[in-house]
């Protein structure tokens, strides 16, 4: 796709993979131009997600918790990218993975080991769930 006008159907998500500098500039450009229409998340230094305003993992988690009656103290969230941070404020037990960007680690209640070090398993063992 060379121009967004070529798309003739609703767009639920746009994801880009590009050099870190290009991704940084693209995120700023989209936020400046379309901040009232879209959510922009860095999933890692080279990847960007663009979603309709109000769409996020956190918003979806809130809907699921309401629907199923889940208690925020009994739900655990894990993430390593900006797109995961919205979940962290929804629950008591939020974990940034060891490989997460510093910004993500700052927002989580806990930091666990990386994916390759079985970070989710380690965190669940720390809480005597496994």
Regions found by a protein language model. Give the residues of each.
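Conserved acidic, metal-coordinating active-site core of Asp-based
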Residues: 1-78, 82, 87
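Short, structured secondary-structure boundary patches
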Residues: 1, 59-63, 95-97, 117-121
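Hydrophobic/aromatic beta-strand patches that form the interior of the parallel beta-sheet core
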Residues: 76-78, 95, 110-112
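Asp-based, Mg2+/Mn2+-dependent phosphohydrolase catalytic module
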Residues: 90, 98-130
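A general structural signal for well-ordered secondary-structure junctions
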Residues: 36-40, 94, 130
């Amino acid at each position: 796709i060379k121009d967004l006008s070529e798309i003739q159907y609703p767009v639920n998500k746009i994801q880009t993979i590009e050099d870190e500098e290009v991704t940084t500039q693209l995120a700023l450009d989209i936020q400046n131009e379309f901040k009232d229409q879209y959510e922009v998340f860095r999933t890692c230094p080279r990847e960007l997600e663009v979603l309709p305003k109000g769409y996020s993992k956190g918003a979806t988690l809130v809907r699921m918790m309401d629907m199923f009656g889940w208690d925020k103290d009994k739900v655990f969230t894990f993430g390593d990218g900006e797109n995961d941070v919205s979940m962290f404020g929804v629950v008591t037990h939020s974990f940034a993975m060891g490989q997460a960007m510093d910004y993500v680690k700052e927002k989580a209640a806990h930091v666990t080991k990386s994916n390759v070090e079985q970070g989710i398993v380690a965190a669940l063992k720390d809480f005597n769930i496994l």
